[in-house]
Design a protein with these regions (language model features):
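Glycine/small-residue-rich loop that forms an oxyanion/phosphate-binding "nest" at active or ligand-binding sites
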Residues: 52, 60-119
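Conserved anion-binding
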Residues: 11-14, 18-22, 92, 96-171
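Glycine-rich, proline-tolerant flexible connector loops at the mouths of alpha/beta enzymes
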Residues: 45-61, 108, 165-175
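Short, acidic/polar
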Residues: 27-39, 83-89, 144-154, 206
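Charged helix-capping and loop-helix junction motifs
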Residues: 59-66, 141-150, 175-184
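Glycine-rich phosphate-binding active-site loops on the catalytic face of alpha/beta enzymes
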Residues: 90-111, 169, 198-202, 212-232
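Conserved, mostly hydrophobic/aromatic
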Residues: 7, 38, 46, 91, ...
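Catalytic cores of alpha/beta
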Residues: 72, 76-98, 180-216
Length: 243
């Protein structure tokens, strides 16, 4: 499945370059309107990131997420600033399908295990962001020495299924996904579902990832640059709806 991404900052839809909060491009001043366009196109899935929340360590763009949920009927996932159970509960009770835990999975694994046990692996997704195979946290502002494989292994053992793996150096660059990293992680953890994020340019990238067993991808800049279209995403997701 392909998830088009909407990144929220100061109430607007933006794109960052390599995760740099200072290097933003405004995509749409009204993210709800953008989500409505995705709904009309029938894409069936949407990836939201609360960038303000990632910096603040708590949900910030809650009202916008609520309005996006009302406008978009497909699978909706949200990440950014979800650091405690209250934040998890807030979004799931709002009707969001999946909540993404990134920093908290690294820094508070016990809480992460608790919410996986309570809500199940279809609703709790682990965000694994970083550079050179090591995990970054706190909106990518804090680069750790923890290998991605350690975090994924611990969370697989806790019952997690979905892992959104973002190569920070590829995000917003249109350089192509890090196929070697993603394919290697999927091969090491066949019971997990690795989701590609960062650098995806077009359907060919997505098909190459599929050959390595990575069947889910997130696209951002490629959509705004026109190298992949909403129509292509919609057709791809309908074709792969059984996955």
């Amino acid at each position: 499945m392909i998830f088009p991404a909407i990144d929220l900052q100061d109430g607007r839809s933006v794109r960052l370059y390599k995760g740099d909060f200072a290097k933003e491009t405004i995509i749409n001043p009204d993210p709800v309107d953008q989500a409505s366009q995705y709904e009309a196109a029938g894409v069936g899935a949407l990836h939201l990131v609360d960038l303000d929340g990632a910096k603040a360590g708590k949900p910030v763009n809650v009202d916008i997420v609520k309005r996006v949920r009302a406008a978009f009927t497909g699978v909706l996932e949200i990440g950014g600033g979800i650091r405690d159970k209250d934040a998890v509960d807030l979004y799931l009770e709002m009707g969001v399908n999946r909540v993404i835990l990134g920093s908290v999975a690294l820094k508070n694994p016990e809480l992460t295990k608790q919410v996986i046990a309570e809500y199940g692996p279809e609703r709790i997704v682990i965000g694994v962001d970083g550079k050179n195979g090591k995990v970054a946290a706190e909106g990518w502002l804090d680069q750790s020495d923890v290998p991605m494989t350690d975090l994924i292994g611990a969370m697989v053992a806790a019952g997690a299924k979905y892992f959104i793996v973002t190569d920070v150096d590829r995000d917003g660059t249109m350089q192509g996904a890090n196929e070697d990293l993603l394919g290697s992680l999927q091969g090491q953890f066949p019971m997990a579902r690795i989701v590609a994020s960062g650098g995806v340019r077009h359907l060919e990238d997505i098909k190459n990832l599929e050959k390595r067993g990575v069947v889910d991808s997130i696209v951002g800049k490629a959509l705004y640059e026109g190298t992949i279209t909403l129509e292509e995403i919609s057709a791809f997701n309908k074709e792969n709806a059984s996955c």
